[in-house]
Amino acid sequence: MATVKRRGNAWQATFRGPDGRERTRTFPRKVDAENWAADERSKLMRGEWIDPRSGRVTVKAFADPWLARRQDLSVRTVELYRYLLDGHILPSLGGVPLAALTPSVVAAWYAKLATEHKTTAAKAYRLLSQIMRAAVADRMIGSNPCQVKGGGVENAAERPIASVAEVGALADAMPEHLRVAVLLASWCQLRRAELLGLRRRDVDLLHGTLSVAVTRTKTMAGEMIEKAPKSEAGRRTVAIPSNVVPALTAHLERYVGSDPDSAVIVGEKGGRLLPQVLSASWSKAREKVGRTDLRLHDLRHSGLTWAAATGATIAELMRRAGHGSPAAALRYQHATEDRDRALADALAGLASSARVASITPRERKTLRISSKPSESLQHAPSASTT
């Protein structure tokens, strides 16, 4: 219900919201007051009406409880979101009321952050947009103010790829008890947390497979977290390439305890391996081989790129990598220079075959004659060079 009454030289519109509370606005002209009241009634009828008081809540006052109730997030993801909020979102936008967080305000914040930290700006923008979508769903604001085109795109540099020979050299450069970590990361395309979570029970040498059932990660606070992979796609069984089986068999016999829950990737004394120890050994190995540009995760990237080069389909790459969407697997469909050259040669071969099939017998005879080196050329002195 809405009414419009004269108040001195102005017109006051009164609108009763669905909660029974009255909201008033004063306008210099009667028509403006009537239009406002009609607009409020229309929003209410369409289910789009929002209590103006909701928009007074600040970004920080909404974002903090939002993150606290996200029980579906992993510990590492919560830490990342907390870092982005405290370091890049709340210092600039935390005190801004939700209703005042307009697209222009967001665009100005993003532009400033992107000049300093492009990749971080993309991550922070995606998080802010996610929070604002929640604010829209909670009817705190009418629309998402995050409207920067491409704001959430990271444009990260293409990650380096190790060759098969380089992976072998990197494995040899690792301490003996960690050599198999390099082989599994590359040939079985395991993530670091999956490597550290691998147990004896997860390895089936008889059938040549390993199961990704547990991951181990370290929080920013230094606590080790052991849990199941965060997605259904991440829980998978991977076929072990036959070239890795002998090394893995020897590793299990020499370094891994008989208990089914014994860790496969172990420390020097046979205990659980700490992530920082693996990182330190990896840093030394890549320096020894001359590939300091490679991260440990790039071994997985390299292995998936090899798989794509053999002709693996997107579905096959998704299953092996534990990806839940085709978008993640598509990045491995890019061709290396060697693969691209092989494709070009194959295409040229198709063209040659088509040409040979189409020429006449007389042309074919001419080609055979012209392909023989002439006697004069065979005995001609070589041209001098300058």
What would you call each of these model-derived segments?
Residues 30, 153, 203, 216, ...:
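Catalytic-site neighborhood detector that most strongly recognizes the C-terminal catalytic loop/helix
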Residues 49-50, 141, 313:
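Conserved hydrophobic residue
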Residues 3, 17, 23-29, 55-56, ...:
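N-terminal core-binding DNA-recognition domain of tyrosine site-specific recombinases/integrases
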Residues 118, 169-179, 188, 238, ...:
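Short, basic (Lys/Arg/His-rich) helix/loop patches that form interaction surfaces
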Residues 172, 207, 216-237, 242-244, ...:
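C-terminal secondary-structure termini that scaffold catalytic or DNA-interacting sites
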Residues 2-57, 231:
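Short, surface-exposed polybasic/aromatic micro-patch for ligand or macromolecular engagement
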Residues 202-209, 293, 312-331, 356, ...:
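Short, polar N-cap/turn motifs at the start of nucleic acid-interacting alpha helices
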Residues 7, 118-126, 137-200, 205-206, ...:
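Basic, Lys/Arg- and aromatic-enriched nucleic-acid-binding interface segment
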